[in-house]
Amino acid sequence: MADDNQNEVKDEVVADIAPFDPTKKKKKKEVVIQDTTDDSVGKLAEKAEACTASEGQESTFAGLKKKKKKPIETSILNEESGDAVEDLNERTGEDEEGEGIVLETPSYPWEGSDRDYTYEELLDRVFTILRENNPDLAGDRRRTVMRPPQVLREGTKKAVFVNFMDLCKTMHRQPDHVMAFLLAELGTSGSLDGQQRLVVKGRFAPKNFEGILRRYVNEYVICLGCQSPDTILSKENRLFFLRCEKCGSGRSVAPNKAGFMARVGRRNAGT
């Protein structure tokens, strides 16, 4: 009986198992696509409700007054900022002083007061305006610096003016005119040698030449109006004229005159 029962069970199992067919394909699982539009619509609805709720809260608190904030004391801040700006201006002014740049307009002592100004203050104001408009005339006068004359002895009766030509170039004057003035003032004779040195008869110290050259500069070189050495000496109709290239003024100067000439030669017995 047991064998019969086992055979029946096997027959049922074999009947349940279908024969394998390789031509049949497996069924694919269906992919379910979720619709996100419903979720987005729901989120938008929630945001709209939140906005309406907040507006309702604002409307409920509209009648209440807001607390006023205490005003900040700006005067202290303005003073501190003004001090900082002044410090910066002073520092920049100190930095720019070496370059000669004026950063601020000049302030006068009488500004902001009713007092009368003094003569010295007005004079300073005039010079500051002159320096701004014409610095060449109002600035410090350029001094004419000349080298001292180098004088050597030649023998016992002659003196040699070594740097005579250099001084003539410094003064911008002709050597003949300078030599004529020197010889007339010294009361002697002389000439230029092969090395362009002035050889003068007699014994003379460098101080003698220095004093004569100073008089020559004051008479034939320096302008009496602006004290400028940039002048031109010209001869017109037997007269010498000195014209300044800076201020344009002109004046006539005296010609060279021969000084006292001592007679050294022997006299005849009958004269």
Curated annotation (Swiss-Prot):
Query: What Gene Ontology cellular component terms go with this record?
Result: cytosol; eukaryotic translation initiation factor 2 complex
Query: Which Gene3D superfamilies does this UniProt record tie to the protein?
Result: 3.30.30.170
Q: Which PANTHER family match?
A: EUKARYOTIC TRANSLATION INITIATION FACTOR, EUKARYOTIC TRANSLATION INITIATION FACTOR 2 SUBUNIT 2
Q: Which family does it belong to?
A: Belongs to the eIF-2-beta/eIF-5 family.
Zinc finger C4-type: from-to: 223-247
Q: What is this protein called?
A: Eukaryotic translation initiation factor 2 subunit beta
Q: What is the stated purpose of this protein?
A: Component of the eIF2 complex that functions in the early steps of protein synthesis by forming a ternary complex with GTP and initiator tRNA. This complex binds to a 40S ribosomal subunit, followed by mRNA binding to form a 43S pre-initiation complex (43S PIC). Junction of the 60S ribosomal subunit to form the 80S initiation complex is preceded by hydrolysis of the GTP bound to eIF2 and release of an eIF2-GDP binary complex. In order for eIF2 to recycle and catalyze another round of initiation, the GDP bound to eIF2 must exchange with GTP by way of a reaction catalyzed by eIF2B.
Q: Extract the Pfam families matched here.
A: eIF-5_eIF-2B
Biological processes, Gene Ontology terms: cytoplasmic translational initiation; formation of translation preinitiation complex
